[in-house]
Amino acid sequence: MIDKILKLKKEKGYVILAHNYQIPELQDIADFVGDSLQLARKAMDLEEKKILFLGVDFMAELVKILNPEKKVIVPDRSATCPMANRLTPETIEEYKRKYPNAPVVLYVNSTAECKTLADVICTSANAVEVVRKIESDVILFGPDRNLAEYVAEKTGKKIFAMPEDGHCPVHQFSENSVDIAKKKHPDARVVVHPECPKPVRDKADYVGSTGQMEKIPEKDTAKTFVIGTEVGMIHKLKKKFPDRNFIPLESAICVNMKKNTLENTLLALETESFEVTLPEDIIEKARRPILKMFEIMG
């Protein structure tokens, strides 16, 4: 099946982009594997006109927004993000009425419609830097309350989370898990995602996006790392650092990320039917705050 996928991909001129949370078999056949920021940048640099995206819907939409002239297909239309879907345009409008002078910073894990109402988009890798560079001490941030809290801690700014209870179910690790991991692996470094709750972040040795997690073993010589994010990241880390040990903090599985399989990836290439499409006005309006992010990042 893998040979069939690679043959079809080449014949039809597709590039396969995969998120770090995809199953190992899909990561291994992808042309590029990365976090949402890395994938967004990669998509803009591609010469190819056809992209098979392995992730969830908001990420595929992001690729389409940045590459409206390219054909973007996905293996499973139902692969979505519950956290992104918690935030609605109506909620953003409500907060904007309450705080009319506060800029709206939206996490990339948001719908295309919501992005049209943002002043700037951010990712978990650059959220702190983006907010720090905005000339306002009050920020409206959504849809992840934990990332909002983390950014507030790092920048000292007043941040209102939209909605108040937005969070990623996969990253709701327990403080107890960190205690157990440290007891079991006393020499290990605990690395967690900023989408984790504050008590978990506070007990970790490092807090960072999946892209940042990849860089930690380059500067830290520890032999063992306990990783607090979706389990798909373990495969990426083991491939990059085969001489180190990577242990999941908990068995955290994103069922939506796992909807993509070798079988439906092959089917997607055969039929090219699940194409990502967005209205032109949505693409145009959602593109502005994304490009603003790149401008801020320099």
Swiss-Prot record:
Cofactor: [4Fe-4S] cluster
Entry protein name: Quinolinate synthase
Function of the protein: Catalyzes the condensation of iminoaspartate with dihydroxyacetone phosphate to form quinolinate.
Pfam families referenced in this protein's UniProt entry, alphabetically: NadA
Record family assignment: Belongs to the quinolinate synthase family. Type 2 subfamily.
Enzyme Commission number: 2.5.1.72
Organism phylogeny: Bacteria, Thermotogati, Thermotogota, Thermotogae, Thermotogales
Subcellular location as annotated: Cytoplasm
Any single GO BP term: 'de novo' NAD biosynthetic process from L-aspartate
Cofactor note: Binds 1 [4Fe-4S] cluster per subunit.
GO cellular component: cytosol
Species for this entry: Thermotoga neapolitana (strain ATCC 49049 / DSM 4359 / NBRC 107923 / NS-E)
Pathway note: Cofactor biosynthesis; NAD(+) biosynthesis; quinolinate from iminoaspartate: step 1/1
Coiled coil: none
Residues that bind [4Fe-4S] cluster: 81, 168, 254
Enzyme category, top tier: transferase
Any one GO molecular function term: quinolinate synthetase A activity
InterPro entries: NadA, NadA_sf, Quinolinate_synth_type2
Keywords assigned by UniProt, alphabetized: 4Fe-4S, Cytoplasm, Iron, Iron-sulfur, Metal-binding, Pyridine nucleotide biosynthesis, Transferase
Highest taxon of the lineage: Bacteria
Residues that bind iminosuccinate: 19, 36, 107-109, 124, 193-195, 210
UniProt catalytic activity: iminosuccinate + dihydroxyacetone phosphate = quinolinate + phosphate + 2 H2O + H(+)
